[in-house]
């Protein structure tokens, strides 16, 4: 990874091949079998903890976004704040995943809609919003009971690694 700020090499990272990707897909499907059974408010609590971890790491992650992507420091902080804000929104959503109940044409019969998780969600993000777009999608998917596979921009791999480390620290609890 090279910084557009000064052209310096920041770090080198490995890229995934097709075989590794297939393993990730299988792991995501296994994780989905359990994650989908968690009640939405419990999933929301996990997302709340992710938001708290992001708050604790806001400055460092903001600096990394700024340096690796080329944004100003304030824009880097703003992008991390967007992640925190969507966590807060998703936590509220986790208690609002209710459906509708409606009358049917049949006597003494009612219909209802109910939300169900769908599975693995793929998230592809561009370099210009290396972390916020991922959070916008992942946090909502997680409270809805889905799991995510993230394909970040090859120009900002360190931002995605940092986010995964922060997120993993919460999921490991």
Language-model regions, residue ranges each:
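Short, acidic, Ser/Thr-enriched surface-loop or helix-capping motifs
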Residues: 3-5
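Glycine-rich loop-to-alpha-helix module at the N-terminal edge of alpha/beta enzyme cores
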Residues: 7-98, 108
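Rossmann-like NAD(P) dinucleotide-binding subdomain of oxidoreductase/dehydrogenase enzymes
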Residues: 99-173
């Amino acid at each position: 990874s090279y910084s557009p700020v000064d052209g310096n090499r920041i770090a080198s990272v490995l890229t995934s091949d097709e075989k590794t990707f297939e393993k990730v897909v299988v792991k995501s499907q296994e994780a989905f079998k359990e994650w989908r059974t968690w009640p939405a408010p419990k999933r929301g609590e996990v997302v709340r903890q992710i938001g708290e971890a992001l708050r604790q790491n806001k400055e460092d992650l903001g600096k990394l976004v700024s340096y690796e992507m080329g944004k100003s420091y304030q824009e880097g902080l703003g992008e991390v704040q967007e992640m925190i804000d969507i966590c807060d929104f998703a936590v509220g959503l986790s208690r609002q995943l209710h459906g509708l109940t409606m009358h049917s044409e049949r006597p003494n019969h009612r219909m209802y809609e109910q939300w169900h998780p769908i599975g693995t969600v793929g998230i592809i993000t561009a370099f210009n919003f290396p972390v916020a777009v991922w959070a916008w999608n992942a946090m909502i998917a997680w409270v809805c009971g889905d799991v995510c596979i993230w394909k970040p921009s090859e120009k900002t791999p360190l931002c995605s690694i940092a986010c995964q480390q922060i997120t993993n620290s919460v999921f490991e609890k």
